[in-house]
Each structure stands twice: as C-alpha cells, then as structure tokens.
C-alpha cells in the first residue's frame, strides 16, 4: 500500500510568496520604465552623429595629445635630473629671464609631492598618468565600451591632470615669474586631451545616462566654439601677463 504525500500551501506560506512575486514584478516594471525613459530621451534628444563624434576621431585626438604630453613629461624628467647633477649649467630651454625652464624646475611647485626628505619631480607622475591615458586612448580606438565607473574615473583623472596643469601655469605667471616651454606644451596637450575625452565620454561611452543637454551641446557644434575660445583665452592671458618679456 503506497502512501501519497500531498503538499498544500498554507495561508502563511502563500502570503510569504506574494511579496517576493510583487517585488520581482516591481523590479521588472522599474527596469522597463528606465529603458522606456532612456529610449524616449534619445528620441527627443538624439546623440550626435558624424565622424567628429565617433570613437576613431575622438580617441585618435586623445592619443595624439597624450603622446605630446608624455614626450613633454619625459623631457621635463630628463631636465630635472640634469639640473640636479649640474645646477650651474643652463638648460636648452633657458631662452631669457622670463622663458626659463631652470627657474621653474628649481621652484617648490615643480616638486609638490614629498616623502620625508625625498621629493619627486612632478614630471615623474606625469609619465605615469599619461601612460594610463595612452592606454585608454588605444582601448577607445579598439571600440571598447568601458564600464560606467571606469569611464567616470578616467574623466575625473583627466580633470585632475587639467586642474594641476592650470595651477602650475598660474604659479608660473604670477608667483615664479618664469615660463617653461615644455610645461606650456604639457598644459595645452592636457587641455586638448580633456576636450577629446569629455566628448568621447558623452557620445561614445554614453555617460551620463540621460545626456540631454550635453547631446544637444555636441550635436549643435557648440563645443567647437567653446574649445576655440578656451584656447584663445589661455594664449591671451599668457601674452597679456608676459608677452613683452617673452619676445624680448
């Protein structure tokens, strides 16, 4: 004689399953709503198209700027070593009292990171940072779509490099009272690098999730005007402060 065991849902077990099913349904609905909202956002504010907004152009520009920046960093590192060994010898980029790499290299601003009695030229960290940016550019040229956290960290890292370059420029203009040509090259390279990476972060990597205003900004080409004004403003400030001394 066989015994058949029947399983019946008690009111308590059935009630316990209802919230789980409702939770899963709510999560599914929220995901669908997010996708629908994102699709509606793209339809209302489509992402810009064309070669200027694609990965090939943007990451190529980013790569070229990063290469220029790392070359400048290597030269600055070599100059720092040479100055340490030959403190009384002028560098090749010491053109006059105003355009003087030696004056900038011997300032405390050129070595802001210190560990005890040891100090390291900022150019060493520039080499490390630019190596990372070159890697990002190569991956971007390979059509890699980064995780959102990585794309955000890359942009924030480039922003930090840009802010440091502008801080050093302000110190050179108003505190050190001397300009380093390789530092100027590094500053302009970092600026172009940041412009390209910001553009790629929006149009290629899709960050932020709802870039309505940014999509319109790039689609209308407003970034071109802003970038040109940006570069011209930097040149104007340098010439206004030290123009006469630079060409003396």
Question: Can you say where each PLM-predicted feature lies in the sequence?
Answer:
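Membrane-interfacial, low-structure loops and terminal tails that flank and connect transmembrane helices
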Residues: 27-56, 204-222
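Hydrophobic cores of alpha-helical transmembrane segments in multi-pass inner/ER membrane proteins
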Residues: 128-134, 186-204, 233-234
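N-terminal signal-anchor transmembrane alpha helix
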Residues: 54-85, 237
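Hydrophobic alpha-helical transmembrane segments
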Residues: 120-145, 160, 164
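Juxtamembrane boundary at the C-terminal end of a transmembrane helix
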Residues: 236-248
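Membrane-interface loop-to-helix entry segments
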Residues: 104-132, 179-191
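Membrane-interface helix caps and helix-loop-helix hairpins in membrane proteins
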Residues: 145, 169-181
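Extracytosolic (periplasmic/ER-lumenal) interhelical loops and adjacent juxtamembrane/interface segments
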Residues: 81-119
